[in-house]
């Protein structure tokens, strides 16, 4: 029904990039802006099942709405204003940088965003046991999966600043967050060239990130796998399940031969979601 509505309103593809999709000439007239249904398929389950006071859930919902609106504006200008360039690039960048700044500062300032560090303890027999610290702390650390002694601290990169290294580490964290949000959301936008490409790839990425979020939200699993325990991050699992479900449902109609395209409404949103998700877990 939604696809038929897009057809009736003539919300369709006008031109595809032949360098990305050599079959694009045959897709003129295929409905676009299908990303709208992806956004609603994410938001509705999260609003019904998620804990809306959880800072991680709040950030993911803000990301979905923020970049969804940015992508919608881009598609609207392309389709209804007949301007193939869409929203001017500088406005896209401003929107993405603004979101990255909000996410980075929120993770820095929110008292809900804490971790429990991994601590290595040497046993009497000489073996090393990894345990979690008793107290939760604010830190600029992150875990690099599948590596021994895998805690990476942004503050280490600015250790030359002495007693100000921790604050400088957070500033660096915010800057990198802005870069990641901007780069990944634009990367997903470029990836949306062939039938099913963006939706399929993003669903696989979402599954991987969901597993990492699930493990890091359980203190026993996190300890066993030697990654940081992040209290409250279990809400990210609820969000990513909605994300994957929305993409798989959309993929049914977006796989070759595509009956609908997500447009920038979808591609900017899913790229931003992946970027912000990686900064949360």
Regions found by a protein language model. Give the residues of each.
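Membrane-interfacial loop-to-helix junctions in multi-pass inner-membrane proteins
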Residues: 53-61, 80-95
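Select subsegments of transmembrane alpha-helices in polytopic membrane proteins
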Residues: 27-39, 91-97
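Cytosolic, membrane-interface loops and tails of multi-pass inner-membrane proteins
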Residues: 2-26, 76-85, 135-147
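Short juxtamembrane and helix-loop transition motifs at transmembrane-helix boundaries
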Residues: 18-27, 82, 158-166, 223-231, ...
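Alpha-helical transmembrane segments
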Residues: 1-5, 9-10, 38-69, 101-124, ...
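Divalent metal-coordination and catalytic microenvironments
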Residues: 34, 75, 264
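Individual transmembrane alpha-helix segments
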Residues: 148-179, 185
């Amino acid at each position: 029904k939604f696809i038929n509505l897009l057809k009736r309103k003539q919300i369709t593809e006008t031109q595809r990039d032949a360098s990305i999709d050599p079959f694009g000439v045959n897709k003129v007239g295929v409905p676009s802006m299908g990303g709208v249904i992806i956004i609603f398929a994410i938001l509705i389950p999260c609003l019904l099942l998620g804990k809306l006071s959880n800072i991680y859930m709040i950030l993911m919902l803000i990301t979905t709405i923020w970049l969804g609106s940015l992508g919608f504006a881009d598609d609207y200008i392309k389709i209804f204003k007949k301007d193939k360039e869409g929203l001017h690039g500088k406005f896209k960048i401003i929107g993405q940088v603004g979101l990255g700044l909000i996410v980075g500062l929120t993770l820095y300032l929110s008292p809900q965003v804490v971790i429990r560090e991994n601590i290595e303890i040497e046993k009497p027999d000489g073996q090393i046991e990894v345990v979690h610290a008793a107290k939760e702390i604010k830190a600029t650390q992150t875990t690099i999966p599948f590596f021994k002694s895998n805690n990476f601290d942004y503050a280490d990169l600015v250790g030359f600043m002495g007693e100000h290294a921790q604050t400088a580490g957070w500033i660096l964290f915010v800057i990198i967050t802005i870069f990641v949000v901007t780069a990944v959301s634009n990367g997903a936008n470029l990836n949306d060239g062939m039938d099913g490409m963006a939706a399929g790839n993003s669903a696989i990425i979402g599954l991987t990130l969901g597993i990492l979020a699930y493990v890091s939200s359980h203190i026993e699993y996190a300890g066993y796998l030697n990654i940081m325990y992040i209290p409250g991050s279990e809400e990210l699992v609820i969000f990513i399940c909605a994300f994957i479900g929305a993409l798989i449902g959309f993929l049914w109609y977006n796989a070759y031969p595509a009956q609908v395209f997500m447009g920038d409404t979808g591609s900017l949103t899913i790229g931003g979601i992946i970027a912000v998700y990686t900064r949360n877990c």
